[in-house]
C-alpha cells in the first residue's frame, strides 16, 4: 500500500512539475540552468577567470550555487553560514570554531560577500556591518563571529565587486 501511494505521489509531483516522468533533454537543461541567473553568472564568470580550479572560494552568505556553477570548492563544510551567526543555534560556538579551523587550514583564494542582496547576512566590511540592522535572530551577533571577522580583516583585502549584484570580492592580502 505504501509503495503504491509513493509511486502515485511521485507521478503527481512529476505532472505538477510540468512534464512526464522521463523529461526530454531540453527540459533537463532548462532545469539545470535555472539557478544561473544573469547576476549569479557574473560572479561565476569572475571566479572562473580569477581563480584556478584547485583553489577554494568562500561565498559568504547563502549562495552555494555560485561554488557549484563555478566549479570552485568551498573551504568549509558550511557552504551557507546561517548557523554561525544565528543566536540560540544549538552548536553555534562549535560550528564557528570548526569554520575558523577550516578557513585557517584551507584559506580561500577569494571571498565573495553576498550581504548586499541578502539582509540576513552580516556584511564582512565593518562599516557596512555597523549600518546594517539585522533581524533579531542575528542581533547581536554571537561572540565567536568577532574572531571570524578579525581573521578575514587580517588576511583579505577588498579588490572588486561583481557587477549587478554589488557583491564585494576579497582576495588574500599579498596576492
Give the location of each predicted region:
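Extracytoplasmic
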Residues: 3-174
Amino acid at each position: 500500500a505504501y509503495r503504491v501511494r509513493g509511486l502515485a505521489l511521485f507521478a503527481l509531483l512529476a505532472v505538477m512539475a510540468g512534464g512526464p516522468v522521463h523529461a526530454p533533454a531540453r527540459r533537463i537543461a532548462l532545469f539545470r540552468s535555472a539557478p544561473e541567473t544573469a547576476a549569479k553568472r557574473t560572479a561565476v564568470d569572475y571566479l572562473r577567470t580569477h581563480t584556478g580550479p584547485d583553489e577554494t572560494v568562500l561565498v559568504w552568505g547563502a549562495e552555494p550555487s555560485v561554488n557549484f556553477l563555478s566549479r570552485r570548492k568551498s573551504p568549509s563544510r558550511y557552504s551557507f553560514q546561517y548557523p554561525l551567526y544565528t543566536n540560540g543555534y544549538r552548536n553555534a560556538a562549535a560550528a564557528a570554531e570548526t569554520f575558523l579551523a577550516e578557513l585557517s587550514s584551507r584559506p580561500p583564494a577569494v571571498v565573495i560577500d553576498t550581504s548586499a542582496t541578502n539582509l540576513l547576512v552580516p556584511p564582512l566590511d565593518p562599516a557596512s556591518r555597523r549600518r546594517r540592522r539585522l533581524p533579531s535572530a542575528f542581533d547581536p551577533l554571537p561572540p565567536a563571529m568577532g574572531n571570524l571577522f578579525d581573521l578575514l580583516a587580517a588576511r583579505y583585502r577588498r579588490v572588486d565587486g561583481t557587477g549587478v549584484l554589488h557583491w564585494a570580492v576579497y582576495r588574500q592580502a599579498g596576492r
